Each structure stands twice: as C-alpha cells, then as structure tokens.
C-alpha cells in the first residue's frame, strides 16, 4: 500500500477518513520523501486546525439567511458562512452534485466546498464547459505535483491547465532529469492519490506564513514576493502536498476517473538570476475511463495526421539543431506558405489594407516606451550592438551607425506601426489607416515548449493594425469579423467567438472600457455568429474578441484575434487633426486572422491529413506516361502545366508498372493524375484521374489546364469532385 507507506514513513498517523486499501507498489518505488515535505505538512495541519476553528466561529457569529440566484431566475435560501455550493447542488440533483467540478459565484470561480458568504448569483461548472475542464486539469496537475514531490523529491514550480490537459514544472537539481521509465511510476502514484480520494483543502495564509510554508522552495518564495500583493494568499493542501495556488479545485481527487501521463521534457524558469532548467511532465485526465479511451482513439487518429509527419513525407519542411525554433521550408512547403500569404494579400487589397515592411531589430527604448520591455522582456531576444563591449565608440561617426543601446528582435509589430503612423501629421480625412505586415517575429519560448510548427522562436503573422476614430470603431470591428469568416470559410474551419472584458488591474478610464465593450458587443450581435462572454479575461490595455477555430477533427485552435488598445496610442502620443482642427487620439485595433502563418499551416496539414485543396496543394498534378514512347509527350504536358503556373511532376519510372505508379500518386495525395498513352499523344489529350481513384476520362489538354486554373483561382475546396 504505497500511499499509506509514505504517510507512515513521515511519522504521521493515517487519517481515519482516509484509511483504505490502495494499489501495492514495490518498495523501490517508495523512497523516503524529503524532510521539508513533513515539516511543511505539519505547519499546514496547524494552520488548518486554526482555520477550522475560525470558520466554526464565523458560522456562529455571522450566520444569516441569504438568497442565492441560480440560472434561469430560480432563487434558493442559504445560510452565510455555512451553506456551500456543493450542498445546493445536492439539493437540486444528485447527478449535478456528482458531475459539478466547481462553481461560479458572481462571475468568479469558486470551490464547491467553500461556504457562501453573501447573496450571490451561482452557476455550476461541469467538465463539459471550458472553465470546468480548466479546473479539472488544474487539480490533476496538483496530483502530479504531489506524486513528483513524494517520488522524486521534486521542488515544484508551476502546474497549470492547458487547452488540452495539464503539465507540472519542477526542479530536480542541475543534473537530474525525469527519465521516460519514471513516467509509469509517477502515473501509478497519481492513481494511488486518486484512489484515496484526498480532499483539496483551501487555506488563506499570511505572507509570513507563506514564507514559512515554502522556505525550502525558492520558486514559490519568488512568486510570493512578486505576485502576492495583499496581506494573504491561498494555498491548497492535497494529501501530503501543499501548494501556493489561487484555485479553485475539485472537491477531492476521487473525482478524477482516469489520468494518463504523456510526455517529459525540459522548460526554463526565468527570474532575476540565471535561467534554471526545470523538468516538465504533461498529462491528460477525465472524469470517466471511457472518455480517456475515446481521447486515446482520437489521439491515435491525430498522430497519423501529425503535421511533422506530413511535412516529412511530403517534403514540406524540416528543422535543424543549428537553428533551433526556426523552420526550413522546402520548395513544396514554400508553395503552401506562399499560397496562404497570397490569399491574405488579395483580401488586404480588397478590404483597404496597406502592406508595409518594418525593421526586425530595434533599440530597447522602443520597447520601454511601448511597455513591452516591462511586461514581455523575458520572452524577447536581445543583444548588444557590435563594438560596445568595453570599447568607446563616441568618436566613430553618426550615432545611427553605432548605437549604444541594447537591441532586441521584435516579438510583435504594433510599436513599429505606431512609429509609422506618427512619422508625419495625420488628418481625420485619411482615417482609418490599416497597416498590414508579414515581417519576421521572434519570441523566446522556453526550449522545452518548442514543437513542430506550433511553437517557434521565429515566425510570421498576418499582423495588421487599424488606427481609426472612435465613431469608426464598430464598422472596423464588423469588417474584421467579416474578414475572419471569409478566410475560415475558404479554409474549411468553423469557429467560435468570445468577448473578453476588462480584467482586474486594467489601465485607462472605466468609461472608455464600458464604451468599447459595448461597441464590441454590438458588433458581435450584428455579426450573427454564436459568441460567449468571458468577464475579466481581456488584456490590461483593452477588451478583445478571442477566436477559436475548429479543424476537421473538431479540435480547437486559437489563431485569430481582435483586440482594442487604449494605451499604445497614448504611450506614443499618436494624434490626428480632427474636423474642428484640434488634435485627437486614434483608437488602435490589433487584428490577425491566420495568426502565425507557420502554426496555421501546421493546423491545416493536420486538418486535411495531407490531402491539400488544389489551390494550396504542393502536389497538384503528376503526369504519368504509359510507356517510354510517351515520355516526351508527358514532358510537354508537364511544361504546359508549369507555364500556366500549376505545380506538376513527372513519374516516368519505367521500372514500375502503370498501376504501381498510379497507386504511388494516390498515396502521395496528388490532386490529379494525367495519364498519357498513345491515344492521348495522338489527340493531344490527357486521361484524368483524381487522388480518390475517380476516373474522369479523356480530356483535351488545353481545356484541362484552363479548368485547373479556374478551380485554383476560385479556391474551391473540392476541385476533384467538380473538375
């Protein structure tokens, strides 16, 4: 009984409510936990005992009748500091009580076992909701952290939920890493914690108490000093583990029906000192085993569509250790990349955007002015100019040729576009100014998070910024939304929108935020697509519309965005002369449809499984001669296709039969095969087949080329069916 053994080794009696038979693990997999684990747990128990007494006193002193408003207008009675959301859920339905993972009280996430304090609006969250999944996977990350502490003596750093599961970063020492063989052991300990149904216990602690609890964890001490601005912060205890966390969490670990650890990698912790290498273990969990099995089946199907696999098989791109975090696009991959960019460029021209080019390297003074240096410095690549290492360049000529400032590669285009807007006087007559930029961006993602095209150090975006007058804002937002719908429709993606409103600590006047949020809401309502409200999830500089597209496998991806920005125009003192001749400040809209072109290309590759639509395809047509006598005509056909701007290859491998070459073309996912024999040569025709083995018969060569061009230019998704 591995978990029981660990408790007894620390000298603590096994709590009566947790005495249970657990899965047996070998003695070798149950090393003695570090001394600080017992010390921290002992202090937590002391604080918890005091907390329970305080709560009992509050229940007696402040108990009063309160009204709880439920969805659909229903109201129920409760007692302040006594009634919990879980108790109310149980009154409504046993099924609801069993499936709820957390509550939402007045728009804020709330533990199910935390007593309600006053009249409020209450909503229950299940695993089916995005918020419910986030809570569920966050709690699962805590279980993983507890296992890592007990098994590996890990010093925990962070354990968040993600869009597709969870991970935990922890420190094992400078030389120690997590081996793949240790994942099954960690997973088994997680299963023990789950089987024990350990409760998640929420406790508020003072800053001094927090420092005592985490005196052996320099990561948590750093977070306490940096993030804890009030007199107290919350910690959660789960079994032997205690962690600094805002919560909320599940009621107990037994609500996790199935958990699987997936990968181990490295990550970086950046503070004021030198970066430290952390170990990252990721996983997935579900309320029921059946959901895990379904996920595994979908994952297996997704692995067959992995864009890295498709990129290798179709010779689209590759990566090299000599340029980490950057992609090498081969000719075929460049064809897809350029087709995507050309699509967006065509829409830019149609919608009144002006494409610009801006520098890649800037003085950090720019980023200080924009505020990015303060908030984003850890994710930027910076360098010293040549000749500044101890060398006096004061007499070396023009300052522009010998800058002394630290330089940084741009991680986004918005400050450069602000400089471009401000470089000459502007009039209200030229608004809106819509600037688009495909310039290369660099962001210093942790090396452990790099993976294929989804996370890169170097990438490009279909980045654009709109400078407009306040009265133009709604029309511009509607234009951005229409842009999204147009592009995603052509690419075959469905999408969902969410309006994120002002967060705590927002900058600017509340009145401006109210007006902007109202404008965004009106634009969304007129747009006619479903959307959700995410209160408090906006950026500190303005509200935003988050866009989640769904691929052919139903997986969500956040690529596009529409964000309002009140702060950057003020920071750069942007002005235009209004109708009355007085200077006025423009509103700035950040917008992207594809987001990272590289990432979107990867999403597309997986969504279509390598069967690219004709207009994007790097494998449009392969010409196959029946015999060597038709090889010369086959080359003429290929040249005719290439002259028209179509991608074509020739398969004249005489060592393979015709049927083998046709099959090879199908497996390679060529959209069309033009087979030419003696009859086709004499008639100047081609015998057309599709990649799905539909035989369209003999067609005139010139007409076939013209038809392909029509289908390509129209960007139809099913050219093989409508040829």
Swiss-Prot record:
Domain TGS stretches: 64-126
Q: Which GO terms describe its molecular function?
A: aminoacyl-tRNA deacylase activity; ATP binding; protein homodimerization activity; threonine-tRNA ligase activity
Keyword Phosphoprotein recorded: yes
- List the GO terms this entry assigns under cellular component, sorted alphabetically: mitochondrial matrix; mitochondrion
Report the locations given in the UniProt record. Answer: Mitochondrion matrix
EC id: 6.1.1.3
The top EC class is ligase
Any idea which UniProt keywords this protein has? Answer: Aminoacyl-tRNA synthetase, ATP-binding, Ligase, Mitochondrion, Nucleotide-binding, Phosphoprotein, Protein biosynthesis, Transit peptide
Q: Which reaction does it catalyse?
A: tRNA(Thr) + L-threonine + ATP = L-threonyl-tRNA(Thr) + AMP + diphosphate + H(+)
Q: Which residues carry this modification: Phosphoserine?
A: 57
Q: Name one Pfam family in it.
A: tRNA_SAD
Example of a GO biological process term: threonyl-tRNA aminoacylation
| Annotated InterPro entries | aa-tRNA-synt_IIb, aa-tRNA-synth_II, aa-tRNA-synth_II/BPL/LPL, Anticodon-bd, Anticodon-bd_dom_sf, Beta-grasp_dom_sf, TGS, TGS-like
Q: What is its main location?
A: mitochondrion
Q: How does it assemble?
A: Homodimer.
> Could you say which protein family the record assigns here?
Belongs to the class-II aminoacyl-tRNA synthetase family.
Main role? Catalyzes the attachment of threonine to tRNA(Thr) in a two-step reaction: threonine is first activated by ATP to form Thr-AMP and then transferred to the acceptor end of tRNA(Thr). Also edits incorrectly charged tRNA(Thr) via its editing domain.
Its protein name is Threonine--tRNA ligase, mitochondrial
Q: Which gene encodes it?
A: Tars2
């Amino acid at each position: 009984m591995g978990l029981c053994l660990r408790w007894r080794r620390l000298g603590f009696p096994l709590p009566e409510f947790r005495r249970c038979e657990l899965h047996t693990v070998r003695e070798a997999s149950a090393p003695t936990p570090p001394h600080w684990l017992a010390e921290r747990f002992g202090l937590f128990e002391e604080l918890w005992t005091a907390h329970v007494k305080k709560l009992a006193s509050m229940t007696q002193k402040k108990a009063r009748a309160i009204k709880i408003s439920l969805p659909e207008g229903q109201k129920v009675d409760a007692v302040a500091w006594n009634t919990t959301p879980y108790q109310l859920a149980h009154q409504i339905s046993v099924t609801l009580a069993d499936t709820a993972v957390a509550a939402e009280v007045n728009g804020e996430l709330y533990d199910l076992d935390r007593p309600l304090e006053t009249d409020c609006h209450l909503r229950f969250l299940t695993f089916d909701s995005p918020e419910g999944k986030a809570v569920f996977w966050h709690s699962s990350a805590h279980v993983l952290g507890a296992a890592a502490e007990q098994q590996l003596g890990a010093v925990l750093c962070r354990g968040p939920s993600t869009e597709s599961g969870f991970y935990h970063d922890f420190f094992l020492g400078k030389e120690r890493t997590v081996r793949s063989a240790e994942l099954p052991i960690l997973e088994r300990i997680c299963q023990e914690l789950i089987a024990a149904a350990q409760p998640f216990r929420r406790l508020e602690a003072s800053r001094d108490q927090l420092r005592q609890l985490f005196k052996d964890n320099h990561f948590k001490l750093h977070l306490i000093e940096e993030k804890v601005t009030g007199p107290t912060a919350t910690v959660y205890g789960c079994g032997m583990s205690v962690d600094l966390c805002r919560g909320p969490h599940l009621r107990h670990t037994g609500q996790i029906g199935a958990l699987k650890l997936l990968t181990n990698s490295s990550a970086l912790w950046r503070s004021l000192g030198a970066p430290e290498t952390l170990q990252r273990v990721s996983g997935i969990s579900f309320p029921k085993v059946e959901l895990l099995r379904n996920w595994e089946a979908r994952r297996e199907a997704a692995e067959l569509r992995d864009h890295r696999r498709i990129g290798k098989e179709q010779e689209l791109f590759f990566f090299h250790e000599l340029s980490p975090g950057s992609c090498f696009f081969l000719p075929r991959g460049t064809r897809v990349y350029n087709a995507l960019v050309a699509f967006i460029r065509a829409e830019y021209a149609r919608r009144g955007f002006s494409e610009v080019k801006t520098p890649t390297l800037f003085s950090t003074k720019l980023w200080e002015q924009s505020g990015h240096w303060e908030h984003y410095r850890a994710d930027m690549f910076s360098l010293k100019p040549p000749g500044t290492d101890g060398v006096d360049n004061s007499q070396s000529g023009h300052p522009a040729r010998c800058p002394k400032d630290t330089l940084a590669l741009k991680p986004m285009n918005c400050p450069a576009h602000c400089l471009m807007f401000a470089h000459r006087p502007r009039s209200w007559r030229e608004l809106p100014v819509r600037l688009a930029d495909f310039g290369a961006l660099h962001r210093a993602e942790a090396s452990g998070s790099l993976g294929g095209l989804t996370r890169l150090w170097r990438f490009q975006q279909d980045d654009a910024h709109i400078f407009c007058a306040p009265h133009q804002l709604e029309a511009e937002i509607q234009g951005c939304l229409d842009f999204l719908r147009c592009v995603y429709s052509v690419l075959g993606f469905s999408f969902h929108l969410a309006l994120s409103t002002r967060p705590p600590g927002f900058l600017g006047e509340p009145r401006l935020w109210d007006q902007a949020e109202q404008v965004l809401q009106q634009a969304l309502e007129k747009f006619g697509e479903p959307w959700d409200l995410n209160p408090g999830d906006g950026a500190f500089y303005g509200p935003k519309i988050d866009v989640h597209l769904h691929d052919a496998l139903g997986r969500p991806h956040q690529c596009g965005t529409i964000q309002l920005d009140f702060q950057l125009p003020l920071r750069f003192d942007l002005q235009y002369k209004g109708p009355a001749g007085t200077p006025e400040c423009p509103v700035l809209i950040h917008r992207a449809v594809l987001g990272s072109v590289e990432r979107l290309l990867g999403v597309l590759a997986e969504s279509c499984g390598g069967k690219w639509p004709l207009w994007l395809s790097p494998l449009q047509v392969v010409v196959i001669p029946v015999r060597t006598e038709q090889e010369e005509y086959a080359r003429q056909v290929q040249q005719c296709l290439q002259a028209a701007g179509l991608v074509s290859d020739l398969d004249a491998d005489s060592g393979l039969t015709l049927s083998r070459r046709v099959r090879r073309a199908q497996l390679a996912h060529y959209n069309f095969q033009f087979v030419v024999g003696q009859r086709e040569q004499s008639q100047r025709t081609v015998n057309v087949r599709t990649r799905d083995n539909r035989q369209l018969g003999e067609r005139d060569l010139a007409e076939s080329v013209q038809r392909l061009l029509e289908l390509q230019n129209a960007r139809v998704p099913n050219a093989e069916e409508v040829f």
